[in-house]
């Protein structure tokens, strides 16, 4: 099934604690789809609350309910202080700094937290679920600073900024800017909530920051991999490359990694109908015909194989895909997990544990960062392949259409692509950066939200690298005069570029061209072009 559809019907997303997907989170975040908390989930939450309250009334010690928090667990707190204890927790941990998450990112975080609480083991009252759902459905979006999470005990600081809005404090976004929550709630006639036993803790003690953001990053990264395949196919056609490296038997039978199979299938589909590509058998026959009798060694201008950057696409992009598939799987598990502490199960002892620890997501998002970094490397090397006259199979230096020397063509446009590859490589794994905190109570932490933010940064950088490649591939088509021989998919891709940016005839200001195409990539425009203009269903 294609990852991106031309049109998506806006139907409510069921938030039941069991079935939420990365794709559904994107719908809530990006398309502003509404959410529905099923009656069964409300009933589970109510049952969990009743179990909890029965325990609490017996004065049984419960972390964060009759005790202080974190390292201060040794402090016993009377249950008469329940509201004050929960409110103080939220206020004190609303200490995030730095830029605010974008509105779609904040919506993803809220959706992730709502689904975790809807699983029914966190002992919050149903009104908490209903209020978070109301926020998503009415477009009330908490203003959440990006910096402050250690990824264990979950994303405390970011989620505190969500919880603070429920009690009428902190800020929400209006037109992308923070305004006081109290003002917005008053305008809408919404009464702030009073947090009861455990509810402050349940709201903030979990992985929903890294998981919500990670869902957006991984979903978009899968689309970026597809768009990398699209431009690679166009570029291969422009330089009259071979389709043989993508034959099914070399992947489905010989080396059946799922991502490799999917990428090879996409490459075959994208170049189907091309009058420019060649096959290995044709090259072999031509080489045999060219060989002079009686010579043991002779030079030929016929290359049976092109460089790795034009041949190892299934192996490289396919491995990126496999990494993203793994991350998507881990995110789906985490989205549908109870990841606060403590947890309550009927007929069982209170579970005091550490499900808030973000290590699974931290590792997964670091893997994503590594994979996307290599995707950027591949794109930059493909750019170089058509800009370097010694490697470009007859194309002029830097794709200059006029007088080389007087004009520089794409020489300058290559620099940001190369610089961004280097920048991506400086972004090391955050999951190995544990720093003890909280009086050494939190002595091993995941830094998972940093991992997710790092992956987001590389994703954004790659859109700019790929933008240069799209521009260069279209320019190669123009200079070579090979448009008529392109496959239907390549023509659709070329025309999508040219709707944004004209051919580079003489040198001009290039930054705007790159940003226009990068923005189109971020919106999935080239996926839509393929879906609209061809019958190809990309994997």
UniProtKB/Swiss-Prot annotation:
PROSITE patterns: PAL_HISTIDASE
The enzyme's E.C. designation: 5.4.3.6, 4.3.1.23
Function of the molecule: Catalyzes the MIO-dependent deamination of L-tyrosine generating the corresponding alpha,beta-unsaturated acid, (S)-beta-tyrosine.
Name recorded for this polypeptide: MIO-dependent tyrosine 2,3-aminomutase
Keyword Lyase in record: yes
Cross-link (5-imidazolinone (Ala-Gly)): 152-154
Paired cysteines (S-S): none
Residue positions where 2,3-didehydroalanine (Ser) is found in the record: 153
Protein residues bound to substrate: 93, 205, 311
Record has Isomerase as a keyword: yes
Annotated GO biological process: antibiotic biosynthetic process; toxin biosynthetic process
Record PTM text: Contains an active site 4-methylidene-imidazol-5-one (MIO), which is formed autocatalytically by cyclization and dehydration of residues Ala-Ser-Gly.
Catalysed reaction, written as an equation: L-tyrosine = 3-amino-3-(4-hydroxyphenyl)propanoate; L-tyrosine = (E)-4-coumarate + NH4(+)
MF term (GO), any: tyrosine ammonia-lyase activity
Family statement: Belongs to the TAL/TAM family.
Highest taxon of the lineage: Bacteria
Active site: 63
Keywords, ordered alphabetically: Antibiotic biosynthesis, Isomerase, Lyase
Effect upon mutating residue 415 to V: Complete loss of activity
Gene3D superfamilies, A to Z: Fumarase/aspartase (Central domain), Fumarase/aspartase (N-terminal domain)
Subunit structure: Homotetramer; dimer of dimers.
């Amino acid at each position: 099934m294609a990852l991106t559809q031309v049109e998506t019907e806006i139907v409510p997303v069921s938030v039941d604690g069991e079935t939420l997907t990365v794709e559904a989170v994107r719908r809530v975040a990006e398309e502003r789809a509404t959410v529905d908390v099923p009656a069964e989930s409300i009933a589970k939450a109510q049952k969990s609350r009743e179990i909890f309250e029965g325990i609490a009334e017996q004065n049984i010690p419960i972390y964060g309910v009759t005790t202080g928090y974190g390292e201060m667990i040794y402090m016993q707190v009377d249950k008469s202080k329940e509201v004050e204890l929960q409110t103080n927790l939220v206020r004190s941990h609303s200490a995030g700094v730095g830029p605010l998450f974008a509105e779609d990112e904040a919506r993803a975080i809220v959706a992730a937290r709502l689904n975790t609480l809807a699983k029914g083991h966190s002992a919050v009252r149903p009104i908490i679920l209903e209020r978070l759902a109301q926020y998503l459905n009415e477009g009330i979006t908490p203003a959440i600073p990006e910096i402050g999470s250690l990824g264990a005990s979950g994303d405390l600081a970011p989620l505190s900024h969500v919880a603070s809005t429920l009690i009428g404090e902190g800020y929400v976004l209006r037109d992308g800017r923070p305004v006081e929550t109290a003002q917005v709630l008053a305008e809408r006639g919404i009464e702030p909530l009073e947090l009861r036993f455990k509810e402050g803790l349940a709201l903030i003690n979990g992985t929903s920051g890294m998981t919500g953001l990670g869902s957006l990053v991984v979903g978009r990264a899968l689309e970026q991999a597809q768009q990398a395949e699209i431009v690679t196919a166009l570029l291969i056609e422009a330089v009259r490359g071979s389709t043989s490296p993508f034959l099914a038997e070399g992947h489905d039978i010989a080396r059946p990694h799922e991502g490799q199979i999917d990428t090879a299938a996409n490459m075959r589909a994208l170049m189907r109908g091309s009058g420019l590509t060649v096959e290995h058998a044709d090259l072999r026959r031509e080489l045999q015909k060219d060989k002079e009798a009686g010579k043991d060694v002779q030079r030929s201008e016929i290359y049976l194989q092109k460089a790795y950057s034009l041949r190892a696409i299934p192996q490289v992009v396919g491995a990126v895909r496999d990494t993203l598939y793994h991350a998507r799987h881990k995110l789906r598990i985490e989205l549908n997990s109870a990841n606060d502490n403590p947890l309550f199960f009927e007929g069982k002892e209170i579970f005091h544990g550490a499900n808030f620890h973000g290590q699974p997501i931290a590792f997964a998002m670091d893997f994503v960062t590594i994979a996307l970094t290599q995707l950027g490397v591949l794109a930059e090397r493909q750019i170089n392949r058509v800009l370097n006259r010694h490697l470009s199979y007859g194309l002029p230096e830097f794709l200059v259409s006029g007088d080389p020397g007087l004009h520089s063509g794409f020489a300058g446009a290559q620099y940001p692509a190369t610089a961004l590859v280097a920048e991506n490589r400086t972004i090391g794994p955050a999951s190995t950066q544990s720093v003890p905190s909280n009086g050494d109570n939190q002595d091993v932490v995941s830094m998972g939200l940093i991992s997710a933010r790092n992956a987001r940064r590389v994703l954004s950088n790659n859109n700019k690298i790929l933008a240069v490649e799209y521009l260069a591939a279209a320019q190669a088509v123009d200079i070579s005069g090979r448009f008529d021989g392109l496959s239907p998919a390549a023509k659709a891709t070329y025309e999508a570029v040219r709707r944004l940016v004209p051919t580079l005839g003489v040198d001009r200001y290039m930054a705007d061209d790159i940003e226009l195409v990068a923005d189109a990539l971020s919106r999935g425009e080239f996926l839509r072009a393929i879906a609209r203009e061809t019958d190809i269903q990309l994997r």
